């Protein structure tokens, strides 16, 4: 994997076939011990990596309703580290939100896609400072102020994710996503 452009991997197999045991002993532990500059990121749908995470001081991120851990979807990357071709991080966030809402809502119209793009730009213009990044809560406030009926329909449709019971991505990030070892636990 060290010779590849990306060291990412996916392990597939039937239930009980030893996938987690193989990965823990053959990939995770050796990487953490032998390569101190490498990062290990695990998406853990069955809560099988919590023990090894605690043993190695991982940043544990619980992705579930009611979780105390939050990830701000509007966080921007470190602009100094962006490649020259990545010169529109706000446009990238608008595209992320378009894709997210298209996947979780039953329908997003072409007009609403345009509104998402506009609202994202306006949200950063109004709220972004050197010390503050807006959240989906502010994004939702800007959305509700838009004049179009489609914007009001969209505001109602996304309210659960911005101010309701599924607002895990609508708060300021309170976990270290730059930590060397991060486990995203999807089961809790």
Task: Identify the meaning behind each predicted range.
Residues 1, 47-59, 65-67, 72-188:
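P-loop NTPase motor domains
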Residues 1-65:
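Glycine-rich phosphate-binding loop of nucleotide-binding enzymes
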């Amino acid at each position: 994997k060290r010779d590849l452009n990306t060291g990412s991997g996916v392990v597939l197999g039937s239930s009980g076939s030893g996938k987690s045991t193989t990965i823990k002993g053959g990939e995770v532990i050796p990487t953490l011990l032998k390569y101190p500059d490498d990062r290990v990121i695990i998406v853990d749908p069955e809560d099988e990596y919590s023990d090894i995470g605690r043993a190695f001081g991982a940043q544990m991120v619980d992705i579930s309703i009611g979780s105390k851990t939050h990830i701000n979807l509007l966080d921007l990357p470190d602009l100094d580290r962006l490649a020259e071709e990545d010169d529109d991080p706000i446009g990238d966030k608008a595209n992320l939100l378009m894709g997210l809402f298209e996947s979780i809502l039953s329908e997003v119209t072409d007009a609403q896609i345009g509104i998402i793009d506009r609202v994202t730009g306006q949200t950063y213009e109004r709220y972004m400072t050197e010390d503050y990044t807006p959240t989906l809560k502010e994004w939702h406030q800007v959305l509700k102020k838009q004049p179009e009926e489609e914007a009001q329909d969209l505001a109602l449709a996304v309210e659960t994710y911005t101010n309701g019971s599924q607002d895990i991505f609508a708060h300021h990030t309170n976990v270290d996503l730059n930590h060397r070892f991060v486990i995203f636990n999807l089961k809790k």
